[in-house]
């Protein structure tokens, strides 16, 4: 809900008079989407609840509220402080600073201007916080092992198709493993598992060299506001050596890569040393004292040993 406040100069006729709000055409931050409204409902809280609203409609940037002059509805008198609650207003798709470029105009029933002002301020729109965050890596929290990882969170704001989920993995600057969490390919398979109904989004994954995995939403489903989401990452590889628990940060963005929610952090597991398995042996071809010959060392790895500099 949003509250629109203003004071009239001239009277707005109670039968067919109108209040028009023209919202900003653009913002310096260039969000993909500016203010929109989905079937707005308008009620006056001042000067009185019986000001009377016949209809409210939103088209492109303009909210038009038409007064209802029937019965005891009073309309808007001259020199009166007014406040009206507007429901179903969607804020811009990413963070924007306040601007004073909105316009309020009141008209008579013939759509002729009564009052107008062009310096109405909108709010600062700030990043929301993701909640219920969690991250799990491969089933065995062991160095060098790859497997199915899961990231889960609940959105604050909606992410439209073409928007992104950006996951930044820890640097592990204290332990300095050869690599941190990574994918063996640049385009890991990502799959939303929650929600599981027809609103489930689809996405592609990109994980080039570095610590950042980016999901770009595709198809026709958005990430809805205030909804739990979870997605899996195929073959995410744990860091190359033992590391302490750290944090992974998740941010949602609109299609212009501008921040919507986050970044919000959650813990990564401690990555432990694996236990060498299989048949462990060191067998020589000659088994008598003092003889130089070949030996065969046999074992099975748990985690991957990096091909460049691994030991």
Where are these regions (language model features)?
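Ser/Thr/Pro/Gly-rich, low-complexity intrinsically disordered stalk/linker tracts of secreted
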Residues: 1-311
């Amino acid at each position: 809900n949003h509250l629109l406040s203003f004071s009239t100069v001239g009277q707005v006729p109670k039968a067919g008079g109108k209040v028009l709000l023209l919202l900003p055409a653009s913002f310096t931050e260039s969000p993909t989407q500016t203010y929109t409204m989905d079937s707005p409902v308008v009620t006056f809280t001042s000067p009185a609840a019986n000001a009377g609203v016949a209809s409210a409609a939103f088209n492109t940037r303009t909210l038009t509220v038409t007064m209802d002059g029937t019965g005891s509805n009073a309309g808007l008198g001259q020199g009166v402080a007014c406040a009206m609650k507007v429901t179903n207003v969607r804020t811009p798709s990413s963070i924007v600073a306040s601007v004073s470029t909105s316009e309020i105009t009141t008209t008579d029933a013939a759509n002729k201007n009564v009052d107008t002002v062009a310096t109405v301020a909108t709010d600062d729109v700030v990043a929301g916080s993701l909640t219920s965050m969690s991250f799990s890596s491969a089933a065995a929290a062991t160095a060098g092992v790859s497997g199915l990882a899961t990231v889960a969170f609940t959105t604050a704001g909606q992410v439209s198709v073409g928007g992104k989920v950006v996951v930044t993995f820890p640097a592990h600057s204290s332990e300095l493993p050869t690599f941190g969490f990574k994918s063996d390919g640049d385009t890991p398979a990502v799959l939303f598992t929650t929600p599981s109904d027809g609103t489930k989004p689809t996405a592609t994954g990109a994980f080039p060299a570095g610590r950042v995995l980016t999901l770009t939403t595709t198809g026709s489903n958005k990430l809805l506001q205030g909804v739990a989401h979870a997605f899996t990452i195929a073959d995410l590889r744990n860091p190359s050596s033992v590391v302490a628990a750290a944090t992974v940060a998740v941010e949602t963005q609109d299609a212009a890569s501008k921040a919507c929610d986050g970044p919000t952090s959650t813990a990564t597991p401690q990555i432990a040393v694996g236990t060498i398995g299989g048949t462990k042996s060191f067998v020589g071809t000659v088994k008598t004292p003092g003889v130089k010959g070949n030996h065969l060392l046999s074992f099975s790895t748990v985690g991957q040993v990096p091909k460049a500099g691994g030991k």
